């Protein structure tokens, strides 16, 4: 246990052991060690540049900090609840290595702007990793869409069969979702990548520290403009968690469809053995546990967003100890999102779609009814009138247990004399799909173009254009 704390000068009694355990955050924030050390090295360089310490002292600090980093990564570092957090642990060990020189490192700095910096460095790194992981998932989806261009599948509304679409069109809908997710994370980086160090406790520092210089050392785009806001701002965490929640909702929606499609009732998809599990009692079972878990883990990430919003909602400026509670939900959400995106990127290329079952389902249930109405419109029948005609024809077919295209022309003409033999071609699955050529529609020419645009976009992201 540490004999003295860096702030205990005005205290007559030592901290209660239970209070030390209660307020300690080291088991959570120790993952920030590398970012904390990176920030401290930059701060030492800034102190030297301002003439507050010598260059030799800054060199010694950097060498000592790198030694601490090595000890942590080698598993030789000892943690102690009495030191509260990762900042104090690193400073305490640096003091053991350097002696009095280490005491100069915290000049012009508070733990308030120090943790604000660590959070931003950490989240900048993790956001970039997530963007890269989403790139892999999006590429996997595009590749699967390319491989299944001639597969048809029912499109659904209200979980009822609606109109047939290309499976590739369905998959590319998820590409659009995950691209928006990637764009949101990219946009969030602009607000994450701002340097708060130099704000000190809340009012700035009396030392002539060049904050722009520190920002350049750490690769930040700029510096914060208000010291009170800088140490109390957690908007960037809330924004990240909002983006993460939306991304997880997209993963959850896709998971739900994979679960449904792999069921015997749908049988559109065979979940690969490597991504399924069995039952401890029912030998025949093959359970889609991976998408089920992703669906379940969505609640954790959304819960993390609610946790930080609730923590921050009533805090006066500037820093409050409540903000220590920002890290558990943030870290958990980052870990969860990364695991789920990585799992999907690995699983999507292995999905086995049942072409015949999907086509048969697309050819049943009157998915071509809208096209029969459109056919009548092209013959001069007003759409609402055509809608009623087809509705009555559907009821007639239902009573006889048949599809529209299975009803004879003579029987269909009882509903409208505008119906001709060419109607049957208009009612085929292929024709229904290929007629939808408006921008964004499911016609193969559109889907092929969408895949091409996506490949170009992904390639540009890889090359950095």
UniProtKB/Swiss-Prot annotation:
<dbReference type="GO" id="GO:0005829">
    <property type="term" value="C:cytosol"/>
</dbReference>
<dbReference type="InterPro" id="IPR009049">
    <property type="entry name" value="Argininosuccinate_lyase"/>
</dbReference>
<dbReference type="InterPro" id="IPR024083">
    <property type="entry name" value="Fumarase/histidase_N"/>
</dbReference>
<dbReference type="Pfam" id="PF00206">
    <property type="entry name" value="Lyase_1"/>
</dbReference>
<dbReference type="InterPro" id="IPR008948">
    <property type="entry name" value="L-Aspartase-like"/>
</dbReference>
<dbReference type="InterPro" id="IPR022761">
    <property type="entry name" value="Fumarate_lyase_N"/>
</dbReference>
<dbReference type="InterPro" id="IPR029419">
    <property type="entry name" value="Arg_succ_lyase_C"/>
</dbReference>
<comment type="pathway">
    <text>Amino-acid biosynthesis; L-arginine biosynthesis; L-arginine from L-ornithine and carbamoyl phosphate: step 3/3.</text>
</comment>
<comment type="similarity">
    <text>Belongs to the lyase 1 family. Argininosuccinate lyase subfamily.</text>
</comment>
<dbReference type="GO" id="GO:0006526">
    <property type="term" value="P:L-arginine biosynthetic process"/>
</dbReference>
<keyword id="KW-0456">Lyase</keyword>
<dbReference type="GO" id="GO:0042450">
    <property type="term" value="P:arginine biosynthetic process via ornithine"/>
</dbReference>
<keyword id="KW-0055">Arginine biosynthesis</keyword>
<keyword id="KW-0028">Amino-acid biosynthesis</keyword>
<dbReference type="Pfam" id="PF14698">
    <property type="entry name" value="ASL_C2"/>
</dbReference>
<dbReference type="GO" id="GO:0004056">
    <property type="term" value="F:argininosuccinate lyase activity"/>
</dbReference>
<dbReference type="InterPro" id="IPR020557">
    <property type="entry name" value="Fumarate_lyase_CS"/>
</dbReference>
<keyword id="KW-0963">Cytoplasm</keyword>
<protein>
    <recommendedName>
        <fullName>Argininosuccinate lyase</fullName>
        <ecNumber>4.3.2.1</ecNumber>
    </recommendedName>
</protein>
<dbReference type="InterPro" id="IPR000362">
    <property type="entry name" value="Fumarate_lyase_fam"/>
</dbReference>
